[in-house]
From Swiss-Prot:
Induction: Up-regulated when grown with elevated levels of potassium chloride. It comes from the Eukaryota. GO terms for cellular component: mitochondrial inner membrane; mitochondrial intermembrane space; mitochondrial matrix; mitochondrial nucleoid; post-mRNA release spliceosomal complex. This is Heat shock protein 60. The gene is hsp60. InterPro entries: Chaperonin_Cpn60_CS (IPR018370), Cpn60/GroEL (IPR001844), Cpn60/GroEL/TCP-1 (IPR002423), GroEL-like_apical_dom_sf (IPR027409), GROEL-like_equatorial_sf (IPR027413), TCP-1-like_intermed_sf (IPR027410).
């Protein structure tokens, strides 16, 4: 019996060693780094990438134009999301095939970059990228030099952008601003007027934010305040986990030009916050070490509402901005020149404000309690420095930013609706419209509906001088691709794209503003009809799309992680061994 048990023990020991040696799952980081890859070359690689690009583009382009369709996206929490926003649709796509997903992810990058730079035009960028890449793939497969194709594409894009810049129109009136916003909000005139009103109230350099409202109607709130591009120093300060931001009502503000690391420096401010039962926001060059640890600990224990933010700017500019904040909040700025140290702080030295919102990237201070006279005096002081002939252009730019933040207001558009889904969809449209309007004010407008790109195809590429035949093909690819947005808009309206685009590029080629209103189904002067696109949006979409898609065309090898191989199933429990009458594992 003893011999059988020892024999069985040795068998189990050997089995466990083998299992440990061949264990397929739970690879550590070092093992994963050396996991084998899967490669595809040449035509096969580009075909797979194109398949992924086509799949994503098909989903995104269905939203383009006044009669574009909505897309329903599953949400990991809450209700599904309904949207017509191109970048939202693009980001939601994840393909099963890894090579196809490579192409889709590059197109997602195009959409995201365009959205980041221009705030709109993501669907147009997707349409252009797909058109340029698909034609590039065909020509490379036919034997063209991909690098020459890319050079031709880049030359044509530069010529098209020059043509658009020569024919742009600056916008000045509130009516034109409303038209741009209306188009970007998919024809919603109410949203257009709301954004136009907000821009009039805070000025073109003012700050406008969009939030989800709690009523059925949209609301516009304009409040005096300041925004700067610094966020919370630690995510532990977040009060709204879903929105990933800190929101305080009536906080106290501690302003310091120096780094804060010692606990003694913040104890008086923390005590004042506790005594007055008000949140505390520390704005300093930096907060670190024990001081930061104490703030986080107090916040996590729920003993104190506190947050820390790095002061905006650098050097002298930081000192000036902190001075602005001091005037705005009626607080003392602790500097090297000030005789009083932080540990001697009294509650009356802390600034105060109506509310503050802090995200990862920026901070908005509303209703600062500084006196109107002090703020006006500070603004005059800034204007005086700007008027000084010795002030450089760079310094004037920074001073203008400070003046706008100090004298301008903050407009908050609260989007209303009957349900969470409706409010979410509408908020996407309002954000798009706001971004497009800012872009239009910045660089001017063009006739919308893809018309400007159509006219660039007809008239803007005549002076491009390619060095060889392959570069000429690159120019032809762009000439064809930039007609695609207009064609897609028309086709999404259920009309024949080829006929209408043909008429616009032949009969109306010399009339820059003449285009097709897909909503009404008629040829009109697009500017007069209020159908416009910001130059910045069109330019950014074209440049980003051509850059990535022509680079994709030069791809010769695609490499992805190979799928994990499933190892053999772990051996089951040892049943009774032969002749042992099924002695169970209970003996071990």
């Amino acid at each position: 019996m003893q011999r059988a048990l020892s024999s069985r023990t040795s068998v189990l020991s050997a089995a466990s060693k083998r299992a440990a040696f061949t264990k397929p799952a739970g690879l550590n980081l070092q093992q994963q780094r050396f996991a084998h890859k899967e490669l595809k070359f040449g035509v096969e690689a580009r075909a797979q990438l194109l398949k992924g690009v086509d799949t994503l583009a098909k989903a995104v382009t269905s939203t383009l134009g006044p009669k574009g369709r909505n897309v329903l996206i599953e949400s990991p929490y809450g209700s599904p999301k309904i949207t017509k926003d191109g970048v939202t649709v693009a980001k939601a796509v994840q393909l099963q095939d890894k090579f196809e997903n490579l192409g889709a992810r590059l197109l997602q990058d195009v959409a995201s970059k365009t959205n980041e730079l221009a705030g709109d035009g993501t669907t147009t960028a997707t349409v252009l990228a797909r058109a340029i890449f698909s034609e590039t793939v065909k020509n490379v497969a036919a034997g063209c030099n991909p690098m020459d194709l890319r050079r031709g594409i880049q030359a044509a894009v530069e010529a098209a952008v020059d043509y658009l810049q020569q024919n742009k129109r600056d916008i000045t009136t509130g009516e034109e601003i409303a038209q741009v916003a209306t188009i970007s909000a998919n024809g919603d005139t109410h949203v257009g007027k709301l954004i136009s009103t907000a821009m009039e109230r805070v000025g073109k350099e003012g700050v406008i934010t969009v939030k989800e409202g709690k009523t059925l109607e949209d609301e516009l709130e304009v409040t005096e305040g300041m925004r700067f591009d610094r966020g919370y120093t630690s995510p532990y300060f977040i009060t709204d986990a879903k929105a990933q931001k800190v929101e305080f009502e009536k906080p106290l503000i501690l302003l310091s030009e120096k780094k804060i690391s010692a606990v003694q420096d913040i104890i008086p401010a923390l005590e004042a916050s506790t005594t007055l039962r008000r949140p505390l926001v520390i704005i300093a060059e930096d907060i670190e070490g024990e001081a930061l640890a104490v703030c986080i600990l107090n916040k996590l224990r729920g003993q104190l509402q506190v947050a820390a933010v790095k002061a905006p700017g650098f050097g002298d500019n930081r000192k000036s901005i902190l001075g602005d904040l001091g005037v705005l909040t009626n607080g003392t700025v602790f500097t090297d020149e000030l005789d009083i140290k932080l540990e001697k702080l009294t509650p009356d030295m802390l600034g105060s404000t109506g509310s503050i919102t802090i995200t990862k990237e920026d901070t908005i201070i509303l209703n600062g309690e500084g006196s109107k006279d002090a703020i006006a005096q500070r603004c005059e002081q800034i204007r005086g420095v700007m008027a000084d002939p010795t002030t450089s252009e760079y310094e004037k730019e920074k001073l203008q930013e400070r003046l706008a933040k100090l004298s301008g207001g903050v407009a908050v558009i609260k989007v209303g609706g009957a349900s969470e889904v409706e409010v979410g969809e509408k908020k996407d449209r309002v954000v798009d419209a706001l971004n497009a309007t800012r872009a239009a004010v910045e660089e001017g407008i063009l006739p919308g509906g893809g018309t400007a790109l159509l006219k660039a195809a007809a008239n803007g590429l005549e002076n491009v001088k390619p060095a060889n035949f392959d570069q000429q093909l690159g120019v032809s690819i762009v000439k064809s691709a930039i007609t695609r947005p207009a064609r897609t808009i028309v086709e999404n309206a259920g009309l024949e794209g080829s006929v209408i685009v043909g008429k616009l590029t032949d009969e109306f080629s010399k009339d820059f503003n003449r285009g097709f209103d897909s909503a009404k189904g008629e040829y009109v002067d697009m500017i007069a009809a209020g159908i416009v696109d910001p130059l910045k949006v069109v330019r950014t979409a074209l440049v980003d799309a051509s850059g990535v898609s022509s680079l994709l065309g030069t791809t010769e090898v695609a490499i992805v992680e190979a799928p994990e191989e499933k190892g053999p199933a772990a051996p089951g429990g040892m049943g009774g061994m032969g002749g042992m009458g099924g002695m169970g594992g209970g003996m071990f």
